[in-house]
């Protein structure tokens, strides 16, 4: 068996019905489109969501919510992830260097999840109340 000899089993695949090729084909003359009307014409169909002039569903329902402009630029870091940083002073750039956050992140917040085993000094990084207590308990500080 070779790749160029692979073929489906005989009779397993049937050719698609060809439209408009005589009445004997079963889909001749109008090619399954019926008689006249918009849907029988070439290029004739309504846009997605069109309900024949009735107010469409997406316009009947109220708008809600908004897209936050800062969503993509804020990151959260767990407390135990700070153990991977081999530096006494942790800044935004330090976290980027160690691959803990993406390069385009502008603000970071440390959350109290897990434990921290070493003393670190946070500079220019926000943290929760629980995370601050844990960092100070381990001998670090938050600036």
UniProtKB/Swiss-Prot annotation:
Keyword hit for rRNA-binding: yes
Annotated region (Disordered), positions in chain: 1-52
Coiled coil, from the record: none
Swiss-Prot/TrEMBL keywords: Ribonucleoprotein, Ribosomal protein, RNA-binding, rRNA-binding
GO cellular component: cytosolic large ribosomal subunit
UniProt xrefs under InterPro entries: Ribosomal_uL15 (IPR030878), Ribosomal_uL15/eL18 (IPR021131), Ribosomal_uL15/eL18_sf (IPR036227), Ribosomal_uL15_bac-type (IPR005749), Ribosomal_uL15_CS (IPR001196)
Feature: compositional bias, Gly residues: 21-31
A molecular function (GO) term: rRNA binding
Single Gene Ontology BP annotation: translation
Role description: Binds to the 23S rRNA.
Quaternary data: Part of the 50S ribosomal subunit.
Family: Belongs to the universal ribosomal protein uL15 family.
Protein name as annotated: Large ribosomal subunit protein uL15
Organism for this UniProt entry: Francisella tularensis subsp. tularensis (strain SCHU S4 / Schu 4)
């Amino acid at each position: 068996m070779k790749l160029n000899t692979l073929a489906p089993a005989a009779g397993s695949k049937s050719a698609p019905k060809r439209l408009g090729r005589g009445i004997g084909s079963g889909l001749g003359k109008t090619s399954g489109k019926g008689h006249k009307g918009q849907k029988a014409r070439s290029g004739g169909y309504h846009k997605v969501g069109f309900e024949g002039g009735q107010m469409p569903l997406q316009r009947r329902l109220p708008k809600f919510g908004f897209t936050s402009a800062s969503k993509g630029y804020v990151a959260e870091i767990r407390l135990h992830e700070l153990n991977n940083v081999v530096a006494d002073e942790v800044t935004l750039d330090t976290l980027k260097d160690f691959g803990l956050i993406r390069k385009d992140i502008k603000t970071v917040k440390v959350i109290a999840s897990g434990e921290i085993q070493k003393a670190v000094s946070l500079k220019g990084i926000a943290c929760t109340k629980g995370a601050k207590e844990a960092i100070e308990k381990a001998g670090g500080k938050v600036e």
